[in-house]
């Protein structure tokens, strides 16, 4: 009787998402789908890091063989501080959502949130070139998408916020990028002073989660205006409901941004960017089913 040859299964590269809370995260499902689509040998898990123990959790994960990680609230700024090197997007965002452990043992940080937003906008609207864009909010979500929007060659980017000084601070920061290359495209404006129709209005605030609306004038919405809320849900967000009432040409929620930023992270780690359409449909169907 001869021995059967042993078959060894190649070890899966380990990835994870860190957050607190983390149980709601759709990242393990999304990256599991991406791995299947691209036939990449990897595992992806959600890790609940203690509020005061993110760094220890992350370093333990890497020491145990982890290759890369996503980071969600409330750890994006802590992740930024831990990185040995950073992308331009992460540097300007002041926050990191994607970490890679490099061959020399150092940690590289990137921020793919804005790249995911722009990819989803282009999927819906086509080119963003020359468009007049209003960005509502001046927090971390807004800051992470300004450089990708500018790189997409928008014609004008107006930032508005309840606390106007925060919007102006972002304008001053990003006006200095690449020797002032984008300074003539950037402007801040108080909400009551907004005038004229915009081609695109992006809500980066979390107001929709509480069913609230930023105090925006109706006049900014025309019959060719597209409105985008970074929040999402089974039903239209409060912001997108308002946009429909103003007869906006198109309303879009942030589910595509979620899938898009994940695809950019996956591509950074694996060198292949997965198609997002099938995963997006699965998530949309799951949202609807869970709401019933």
From Swiss-Prot:
Pathway listed: Metabolic intermediate biosynthesis; chorismate biosynthesis; chorismate from D-erythrose 4-phosphate and phosphoenolpyruvate: step 4/7
One example of a Gene Ontology biological process annotation: amino acid biosynthetic process
Record keywords: Amino-acid biosynthesis, Aromatic amino acid biosynthesis, NADP, Oxidoreductase
One GO CC term, this protein: cytosol
Enzyme nomenclature, EC number: 1.1.1.25
Domain of life: Bacteria
GO molecular function: NADP binding; shikimate 3-dehydrogenase (NADP+) activity
Enzyme class: oxidoreductase
Residues given in the record as NADP(+) binding sites: 137-141, 161-166, 230, 254
Active site: 76
Family: Belongs to the shikimate dehydrogenase family.
Function, in words: Involved in the biosynthesis of the chorismate, which leads to the biosynthesis of aromatic amino acids. Catalyzes the reversible NADPH linked reduction of 3-dehydroshikimate (DHSA) to yield shikimate (SA).
UniProt subunit comment: Homodimer.
Listed name of the protein: Shikimate dehydrogenase (NADP(+))
Gene name of this polypeptide: aroE
């Amino acid at each position: 009787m001869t021995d059967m040859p042993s078959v060894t299964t190649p070890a899966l590269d380990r990835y994870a998402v860190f957050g607190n809370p983390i149980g709601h995260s759709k990242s393990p499902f999304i990256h599991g789908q991406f791995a299947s689509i691209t036939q990449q040998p990897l595992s992806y898990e959600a890790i609940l890091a203690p509020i005061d123990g993110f760094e220890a959790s992350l370093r333990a994960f890497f020491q145990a063989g982890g290759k890369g990680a996503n980071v969600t609230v409330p750890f994006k700024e802590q992740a930024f501080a831990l990185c040995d090197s950073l992308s331009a997007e992460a540097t300007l965002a002041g926050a990191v959502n994607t970490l890679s452990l490099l061959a020399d043992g150092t940690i590289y940080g990137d921020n793919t949130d804005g790249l995911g937003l722009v990819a989803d906008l282009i999927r819906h609207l086509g080119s963003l070139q020359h468009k007049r864009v209003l960005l509502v909010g001046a927090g971390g979500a807004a800051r992470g998408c300004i450089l990708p929007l500018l790189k997409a060659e928008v014609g004008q980017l107006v930032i508005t916020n309840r606390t106007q000084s925060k919007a102006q601070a972002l304008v001053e920061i990003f006006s200095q990028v690449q020797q002032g290359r984008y300074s003539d495209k950037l402007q801040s404006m108080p909400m009551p002073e907004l005038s004229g129709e915009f081609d695109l209005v992006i809500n980066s605030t979390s107001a929709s989660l509480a069913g609230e609306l930023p105090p925006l004038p109706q006049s900014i919405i025309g019959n060719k205006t597209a409105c985008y809320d970074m929040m999402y849900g089974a039903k239209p967000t409060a912001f997108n409901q308002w946009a429909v009432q103003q007869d906006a040409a198109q309303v879009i929620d942030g589910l595509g941004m979620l899938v898009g930023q994940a695809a950019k992270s996956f591509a950074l780690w694996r060198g292949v960017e997965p198609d997002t359409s099938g995963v997006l449909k699965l998530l949309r169907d799951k949202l609807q089913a869970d709401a019933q």
